Amino acid sequence: MPQFDITMAGELNLDLILYGLPQEMPPERELLASNLAITLGSSSAITAHNLATFGSRVGFITRVGRDSLGHTALDRLRGASVDVSRTSQSPSLDTGLTVLLTHGGPRHILTYPGCMAEMSLAHLDLDYLKSARHFHLSSYFLHRALVPQIAELFRELRSAGLTISLDTNDDPADLWQDGIQEALELVDVLMPNEREACKLSGTEDIEAAIEALSTRVSLLVVKRGAKGATAVAGGKSVSVPAISVEIVDPVGAG
C-alpha cells in the first residue's frame, strides 16, 4: 500500500488580505482598510491542506526561507496532518508572500515569489513523491527553476505508476509557453478556469477550448465561476451549475 494517497511539490506562502479599501486608490495617499486577515496562501499549499482536511494522506514537498512566514505556513499544514518532512530551507531567500487588496471590485493580487522560484528537481525527493497513487502540481508558471524540468518529473512519476493532475493557474508573463504543451501530454487530469483553458488552447472561444483540451487529457475539469463547472472524459461532457450562495470572500476558492 502506498504511503500517501497524493503527493505534491509546490509553492508555500501566506496571504495578507486587506479588506474594505476604497474603490479608488490614488497613489501617494494613506488609505485605510477596514479589516485584515493573514491566512495560508498559494494554490499548492491550499490544495494540500484541503485534501488532508477531507481525509486524504498527503505528502507535500516545498521550500521556505529562514523566517517566521515559513514556520507559520508549515504549522498550518501540519495542523491539517499534511506531511511536510521533506521541506527544504533556502539559505538566501525569504518565504514568499501574497498581498491581496480588495476594494469593491476586482482584486489586486501582488506576489513576492521568494524561494518558491528557486525550487528545482534537485530539491525533490523522487522516492518520496513516488510513494503515492497520484501526484498533483499547481501554479506551473511560478516554479521558475522547476519549469524546464516539469515534463521530466512527470515522466519519472508516470513510470512509477502514478497518475498526474495539473492546475496551471495564471501565467504572470501571460505568454503561456515554458514547455506547457509538452507537459500537458503527460497529464491525466487538467483543471483550468475558463481564461486559462482559452490561453492553453490558443482561442478566445471557451467551447472550442474545452473541445480541444478534452482530447489531450483523460479528464478535463473547467472551473467556470458563477456558471459552475464542466467536466469532459471519454468524449462525454457534464456541466454542473454553481450553488447559489452569498459571496463572503473568494480568496482561495480556486
Segment roles from a protein language model:
Residues 1-63, 68-79, 247-248:
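Glycine-rich phosphate/adenosyl-contacting loop at the front of the ribokinase-like
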Residues 49, 97-101, 108, 228-232:
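Short beta-strand scaffold segments in enzyme catalytic cores
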Residues 58, 84, 164-165, 220:
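Hydrophobic beta-strand scaffold residues
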Residues 76-93:
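A glycine-rich helix N-cap at a beta->alpha junction
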Residues 127-128, 180-183, 213:
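Structural alpha-helical scaffold elements that stabilize or flank donor/cofactor-binding regions
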